[in-house]
Amino acid sequence: MLLAAGTRYAYRLCGRRAAAALQGRAGRSCARSVSTSWSPVGAAFNVKPQGHLWDLLGERRGLFGVPELSTPEGFQVAQEEALRKTEWLVERACSTPPGPQTVLIFDELSDCLCRVADLADFVKIGHPEQAFREAAQEACRSIGTMVEKLNTNVELYQSLQKLLDDKKLMDSLDAETRRVAELFMFDFEISGIHLDEEKRRRAVDLNVKILDLSSAFLMGTNFPIKIQKHLLPEHIQHHFARDGRHLVIDGLHAEASDDLVREAAYKIFLYPNADQLKCLEELLSSRDLLANLVGYLPFPTGPPGTIAQTPETVMQFLEKLSEKLCERTRKDFEMMQGMKTKLNPQNSELMPWDPPYYSGVIRAERYNIEPSLYCPFLSLGACMEGLNVLFNRLLGVTLYAEQPFKGEVWCIDVRKLAVVHESEGLLGYIYCDFFQRANKPQQDCHFTIRGGRLKEDGSYQLPVVVLMLNLPHASRDFPTLLTPGMMENLFHEMGHAMHSMLGRTRYQHVTGTRCPTDFAEVPSILMEYFSNDYRVVSQFAKHYQTGQPLPKAMVSRLCESKKVCAAAEMQLQVFYAALDQIYHGQHPLKKSTTDILMETQEQFYGLPYVPDTAWQLRFSHLVGYGAKYYSYLMSRAVASMVWKECFLQDPFNRAAGERYRREMLAHGGGKEPMLMIQGMLQKCPSIDDFVDALVSDLNLDFETFFMDSK
């Protein structure tokens, strides 16, 4: 998951993209601190980090090597310096004649703010010390205020407008520079800068209102429900937390084996809340008003140049996918209902609270998949070594563990990796915050700390990212052992990290993962395909004690088990995406959000709507992925096509790996996604191609079926 998504809209001017080429800093630059005893890199993750003498005696470098951030007060220093430099760059932008230099100055302005904002955005939720979190939060507010001022600075806007209005000048620019200029203009216009003063003020007010409503709605999506104990049967009360005479229902309890527990949790947790309903309605109407006001109708799915391009194309994609899934989904529901009848004959109707539980029961019964059987073969160090082997053979990239300086990391468990290309040298740094700790966010995610870009002196600003997971700690007797799901998540997040390392653009505004949302998940989902291929897994999955390799049959069964009821799960995602599109379509909405939910569920899912529930009020993705929830399905379709066309025959094919880097990773967000996809696949895929790619992934592997039936 890309947590940068929220920042991308809160700090619109703090764009996305980075720069070109790095000359020969390879071995020598990181040899100083790379420990040769940590070769292969996996060894660094299979032992607890030990303190070094320079941890105690050496100078304090500050978080991520930023000298000011050795203390929380350093955020104030960093933001003040950024704001001073911002004022100087604004003057430069306004006094420079229109040309390519205009875009470079805008990008430096974006970088100046993002280097504080992006770092603070991570620290405010990822740092274990409250003082650092609070200082980072204040820095986010300060930079956010400046961004809003810049987005409504008429003189700054006009300096960019002069460039875009000059057709001859624009035609003389390269495609990446033109796209970055257009993206900066989009950021201005979504703030209403091109409107008269009264409308511009309304646009600013609407932006503020949308931010406030988004925050309130997001909080409401997780708000627990308290009910009096006597309202639930006594024999299921122990499944819920107690608060005096009340029970606390804080989720759907989707994996509970008792049908009544799941039913009660579903009906109570999703019971309509009038305040939350009003908040959602105001959020949707405010977004529509803003889109009308600034001239982006309907509510924009993000900056221009997505894969889908239009809401009509998105709905066409979802409708065709739903049609192709229909029969498979019906069979999945029949299979789940059969299992429910077998286990609970008195109450056998399949309901919306049933699929997660019964699909798991069927999966376990059919394939005997017990995650604990896999864990001894999947030590964290082995998985990291597997990634290292894969990146080296595909892309010529090696990961080196470095010893961080005192104060550089926020927790002793954080590992620092230098990413080095065999001929281009040092590409950037990945900080691996992989282990559980108190008050750490539970979501696995990727943060951009510093985007790459080509600087004025010709050197390259190296990208820096953080990967955050929640893995168990190693014990005295064994290293950190991963379940198959944890291993797949690790590969997924490393896909984002390598996109950041190899998306080496000229402009920070479009560096690495700073690209349209419906393309951003392609590199990470593609890595999931590698993690499920035995030829890749066999390179590293060995028992941490005996060295015995993970049997091929176990990998095959695991992969096939993921296809159990997968059509029904994909159909659910289609329903969510369609609901999101309708909510952000034509306004005013013809019916209430709950009536729309009921109709959309009937059309796009297949299980009945439950009266007196309002699932949409718990749909947190309506905030960060408003009108963009389809993106995950679209990205998965592209990743599936790339896998089948380019890597299925040989997952270590270096020529295919180099083409993947050249055609897809290297451009970040500096090139339209469809052009990147076309370059990679050597064809322009249609909506039908995307749909077929997703549906074909659901087909069973008959070799595994035959093997298991013997």
UniProtKB/Swiss-Prot annotation:
* SUPFAM superfamilies in UniProt: Metalloproteases ('zincins'), catalytic domain
Binding positions (Zn(2+)): H492, H496, H499
Cofactor(s) needed for function: Zn(2+)
Main location (coarse class): mitochondrion
Q: What is its EC number?
A: 3.4.24.59
Any GO CC annotation of this UniProt entry: mitochondrial matrix
Localization, UniProt: Mitochondrion matrix
Residues with N6-acetyllysine modification:
K124
Q: Which UniProt keywords apply?
A: Acetylation, Calcium, Cobalt, Hydrolase, Iron, Magnesium, Manganese, Metal-binding, Metalloprotease, Mitochondrion, Protease, Transit peptide, Zinc
Q: Look up the transit peptide and give its residue range.
A: 1-33
**What positions does UniProt annotate as the active site of this protein?**
E493
The catalysed reaction is:
Release of an N-terminal octapeptide as second stage of processing of some proteins imported into the mitochondrion
InterPro entries (UniProt xref): M3A_MIP, MetalloPept_cat_dom_sf, Neurolysin/TOP_dom2, Pept_M3A_M3B, Pept_M3A_M3B_dom
* Disulfide bridge positions per record: none
Gene Ontology biological-process entries: peptide metabolic process; protein processing involved in protein targeting to mitochondrion
Top-level taxon of the source organism: Eukaryota
Q: Tell me how the cofactor is bound.
A: Binds 1 zinc ion.
Oligomeric and partner information: Monomer.
Q: What does this protein do?
A: Cleaves proteins, imported into the mitochondrion, to their mature size.
**UniProt name for this protein:** Mitochondrial intermediate peptidase
The species this protein belongs to is Rattus norvegicus (Rat)
Taxonomic lineage from the root: Eukaryota, Metazoa, Chordata, Craniata, Vertebrata
